Amino acid sequence: VHDGPKMGGYSYRMPAYPVAPGTEVPTEDMVIMTTMPVKSLITSPATGTQMTGKTLDIRGHTWADGDVASVHVSHDFGQTWQEAKLEKPVNRYAWQHFSATIELPQAGYYEIWSRATDMEGCTQPVTTPGWNPRGYGNNMVHRIAVLAG
C-alpha cells in the first residue's frame, strides 16, 4: 500500500543487484526498500567551522531499522574512536540525539567522523556501501571538516 504516484519508479527503490555509478536501471529491476541501515549525522558544528581553541562540542542524530546501540566519533581518520552520549528516542520511530566533547591534540585541520552501531552489531561503513540512482541506503560514516586554531 502506498499513497500515490510519488511511490512509483525509483522512489524508495534500489537496484536488485550491484550496478556501476551512472547505470540506468530498468524500473522492473528496482526493489522497494524495506529496511533502514544504521546511520548517524553530525549536525553541529557545521563543516568548515574555524575554532579558536581545541575543545570541540559535537551534536548529531542517529537512526536505524531497529535500536541504535552506540555512536562513536573520531578526529584522526578512524584510528581511534570516542563513545558519544546517546539519548533515548522519544518513540520507536524517532531519531536519537547524540553528543560528545573531544579535545583536539593541536591546531590544524581535522575531519570529525561519526559512526553508529545498531543492536544487531551492524556498523556504518567507512566507504560508500554501493551506488544507486537516488542514493538510498548510503549509510557511510559521516564526516565534517574543522580547523582548530
List PLM regions with ranges.
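Extended, aromatic/histidine-rich regions of cofactor-dependent oxidoreductases associated
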Residues: V1-G149
